[in-house]
């Protein structure tokens, strides 16, 4: 029988795995910082620096950036902040994975716990959960045409969705913020928080338009000795673009959650 074949390529899910790790480290307070009286607030982010696919396992390397706001006995400041980088490197066993596979890693911060050993040293314990999603390339051959007089062929057009591009990119925003007239000048920034709201993305020709709002909170030491701790808030509109050569007007976009 005479027929034509065509190769079809795709990406298929292969395996999933979750792993929980604990980062435990004692950290000294820098000489330039006042003594720690009490921890007030903590937070952190995970920076994944490397992922390596191996036979039956995956290596992940990165750091947890810890930030803390604490109270002091210093009457001129009362509040101070500190930051530490806590490195980690882990191997997770996943049966059947190969160096040619692809991995997507997500994380959740389950717990951040601090213990004050003394006024110059704190113990930091972080509990993280990593989710690994393994995919592999698929290549299959399918019959698209049969050249035979005695063979009947039924054809049907089917709409399919094709993955054009799957990548990460960074939208860089730069704004100059002016303090309200009733606020003291900034001597030292202690704590910042940035929250995004109503974030939306729209496909354009070879670009992605991003719109929304950015709420900024800053806690700082002012130059006014009578009111040393000050804060300020801003709401900034977001309207920027990311270059994406693969995108066209009929492309469907999915933002990560």
Regions found by a protein language model. Give the residues of each.
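Surface-exposed interaction/gating patches
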Residues: 47-49, 160-222
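Hydrophobic, ordered structural segments
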Residues: 104-149
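Short amphipathic beta-strand and strand-loop transition segments with alternating hydrophobic
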Residues: 41-53, 104-117, 191-203, 253
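Short, solvent-exposed beta-strand/turn "edge" segments of beta-rich domains on protein surfaces
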Residues: 14-17, 35-40, 50-61, 116-121, ...
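Extended beta-sheet lipid-handling architectures
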Residues: 22, 43-48, 61-63, 85-87, ...
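Extended intrinsically disordered, low-complexity coil regions enriched in Ser, Thr, Gly, Ala
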Residues: 58-100, 137-154, 208-211, 215-249
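Alpha-helical, hydrophobic structural elements that either
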Residues: 1-33, 144-183
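Conserved small/polar residues in nucleotide/adenosyl-binding loops
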Residues: 251-257
